[in-house]
Amino acid sequence: RLIGRERGYHGVGFGGISVGGMVKNRMYFGSMLNGVDHLRHTHNLKLNAFSKGEPEHGAELADDLERLVQLHDASTIAAVIVEPIAGSTGALPPPKGYLKRLRELCTKHDILLIFDEVVTAFGRMGKATGSEFFGVTPDIISCAKGITNATIPMGATIVQDFIYESMMENADAPIELFHGYTYSGHPVACAAALATLDI
């Protein structure tokens, strides 16, 4: 089972729409991925209308994960995916302490935490990643756009060592991660990414 968040955006592919919380993105499609649920969103204009930076109210909304754990059982939840800053729903920063609390709960229940950093990684927030900016370490980071300075399409997935080691130890094929696309690892995209990182 995967847990997304209401108002979350993770692209318009089948999986991204399923875990994303954008109702209008799902309304033109039939059934989505099974086993997906959503945390409540953190946008509260009434309480946070004049907040500067991270909103003061709403960190407790991370505890909505406890409701989903009670509903589904933690052993059935593989991961929670959120954007450090909700991009397509208004560039909304999380409430103070929200991401740290989400990290604590994922650790407590042995659930992976994924940050979708397509928008926030590679200097967009003055740090290498949004996770570094907020001082929260997820288990997986998905990133794109800024990795090549948006000059050529490329994306990447960054994982904690324990995930990488698990993939290497349990590979049942000559390819460690049997997943990819026709243009994955394109040399020009990789060169653009390396040049961007050098800058």
Where are these regions (language model features)?
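Conserved N-terminal phosphate-binding loop of PLP-dependent enzymes in the Aspartate aminotransferase
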Residues: 1-199
